[in-house]
Amino acid sequence: MAPPEAEVGAVMVMAPPTPGTPGTPGGPLITGMRVDSMSFDHRKPTPRCKCLPVMGSTWGQHDTCFTDFPSPDVSLTRKLGAEFVGTFILIFTATAGPIVNQKYDGAETLIGNAACAGLAVMIIILSTGHISGAHLNPSLTIAFAALRHFPWAHVPAYIAAQVSASICASFALKGVFHPFMSGGVTIPSVSLGQAFALEFIITFILLFVVTAVATDTRAVGELAGIAVGATVMLNILVAGPSTGGSMNPVRTLGPAVASGNYRSLWVYLVAPTLGAISGAAVYTGVKLNDSVTDPPRPVRSFRR
């Protein structure tokens, strides 16, 4: 609750934050109220998200939501460590679903495979997003850098962490599930043109949603993990039988290296990257500008 108005000339003494205050030890991860302690203005309840930190500007437009909610100072080493672990978890779980499905004669089904990937994305965003931004995908990293949401200087290191994590996870899967590794390889069952189009479209959809929850001050950033995970699940339900529903170059690259099967690999490297850039660019172009009369919410995103 906001403190009462101070009399003119009176000295205002602010009480220290209680353990229940977000950002203090023992405090909640997300709160539904934001109070401007400098002006004591009564603002509408506005949610805060601490899972996906952001900073910077987009196409010359300053994102004012960052001015009163600074990102923690996280070293690049910690970011890369979180990105490696997050990508490892994603590739291991998302690839294990189809492998188990093959090994046990369809026990997982398409819905199970989609759930493995979607739930993995959700929990990784919620657990590591505040550290590295939880990119987990070179296409996302490149798209955000191209649209000035992410520094180009960090792109090679992020991609190296993602690729190495994917290969490590894939060889771990090979050791556990050999000889069923082929079940986790994404290979098109349609023509190359159809596979390219499908991967482009589903990655476009994914980055459209990611850019919304990551960069728009009016999007519900607290639901970023759920929104992105649900999008991944939906896309796999749509494209899984045709292309495997990769949307991510390292989702295909790691299992391809571990199994030695590089069939149509270029489709899964090029189409998701082009789709990601297009999806992010389209949302950036259509999103509403911040209104002076409607204070933006302090949200965080995939940008670190």
UniProtKB/Swiss-Prot annotation:
Chief subcellular location equals: membrane
State the conditions that upregulate or repress this gene. By boron limitation in the root elongation and the root hair zones.
Q: Which domain of life is it from?
A: Eukaryota
Q: According to the UniProt record, list the residues that bear Phosphoserine.
A: 301
A Pfam family of this chain: MIP
Tissue/organ expression? Expressed in rosette leaves.
List the effects observed when the gene is inactivated.
Plants display lower boric acid uptake into roots, lower biomass production, and increased sensitivity of root and shoot development to boron deficiency.
Protein purpose:
Boric acid transporter. Low water transport activity. Plays an important role as plasma membrane boric acid channel for the boron uptake required for plant growth and development under boron limitation.
Recorded domain comment: Aquaporins contain two tandem repeats each containing three membrane-spanning domains and a pore-forming loop with the signature motif Asn-Pro-Ala/Ser/Val (NPA).
Kindly provide the name given to this protein in its UniProt entry.
Answer: Probable aquaporin NIP5-1
Gene responsible for this protein: NIP5-1
